[in-house]
Amino acid sequence: VGNTTAATGKGFAIASAALTSLALFAAYVTFTGIDGINIFKAPVLAMLFVGGMIPVVFSALAMNAVGRAAMEMVQEVRRQFKEISGIMEGTAKPEYDKCVDISTKASLKQMMLPGLLTIGLPLLIAFLPLVFGMDQMIIAEMLGGYMAGVTVSGVLWAIFQNNAGGAWDNAKKSFEAGVEINGEMTYKGSDA
């Protein structure tokens, strides 16, 4: 029930995010009054590609952030095992509060760049062309192209990552139970 519920929940979350993105896009088009996005204009096409790239870049930055935060946690746990005798035997209590503190601080610190990217890039697209004297309608189309790229790429990337995560989870469970590879049973902790 747990995996099925999680998989169903992820599907609903992806569908909800896709519909929300489309609703925001429709609201943007209505608010700006643009009647279409002409991708034959080079700046608009460029922003479409930039938008398509953002979910991938954000995901890479977020995964790196998780890895760095996890390494900080591993170092703290190793320190506690070295310095506090009796943790492994269950006679001494670990310093849970330090682990929670590291987790909180590291997650906030490491997610600054992805957060700034998602907030700053649309603002940059909106205001930087004004410095160069571009027409406001072309800027509106550029932002629309950016939003379209983010929406399409983001939905596809979410589906891909959901499926990849499910495959990794199933592979992990298979190895925990034992998998036959080339006639040999392979278990968790083996070279496979």
Task: Spell out what each predicted region is.
Residues 1-192:
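Hydrophobic packing and interface segments
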